[in-house]
Amino acid sequence: DYHKAVDNPQAPTLFAAIHAAEWNKAVQITPSFTLEKAECDYTDPATLFPHGIDVVYFDAFAPEKQPERWAEEPLRRIFDAMNPGGVLTTYCAKGEIRRRLQSIGFVVERLAGPPAGKREILRATKPQL
C-alpha cells in the first residue's frame, strides 16, 4: 500500500539513504535490505550485466521516445539476470509493453499508480522455479 509506505516515519531517512547510495557498490540500507545500484547499458549485448537481481525500477522514457529501451532482447536480458521471484516495476502501463513482458516470461499485474501521478503502473514478477 503506497500510503502505508509513505506514512512510515522512517520513510524520509530510508529514501535519502537509497538515493545517496554509491553506484556499483553494495550498501546496507537496513539490516534486511542491501542495495546495489548497477550503472550499465542493458541494451548493449557486450556489456557485462549483473546477475542475482531482486528488484528493477524501470524508469525509461515512453516506448515512442526510447524504443531501444523497450525492445524484447534488452528486456529479456533483464529477465535472465533476475532471481526467481524478482520484481520489475514501471510507470509504463501500455498494453504492448505488458504483453511483451508476459511473452518474455514475467507474470504481469496492473496496479493503481501513486496519488497525483499515473493512473496505472505495471509490476512484473519473474516466476519461482
Q: Can you say where each PLM-predicted feature lies in the sequence?
A:
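Short SAM/SAH-binding signature in class I
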Residues: 35, 51-60
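Core SAM-dependent methyltransferase catalytic element
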Residues: 104-129
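Conserved beta-strand signature within the Rossmann-like core of class I S-adenosyl-L-methionine
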Residues: 55-57, 84-92
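S-adenosyl-L-methionine
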Residues: 1-49
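Short alpha-helix
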Residues: 93-104
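Hydrophobic/aromatic beta-strand patches that form the interior of the parallel beta-sheet core
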Residues: 36-38, 89, 109
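Short glycine-rich, flexible loops that bind phosphorylated cofactors or substrates
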Residues: 64-66
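A short glycine-rich, Lys/Arg-flanked "PGG" loop and its adjoining helix->strand segment in the class I
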Residues: 68-84
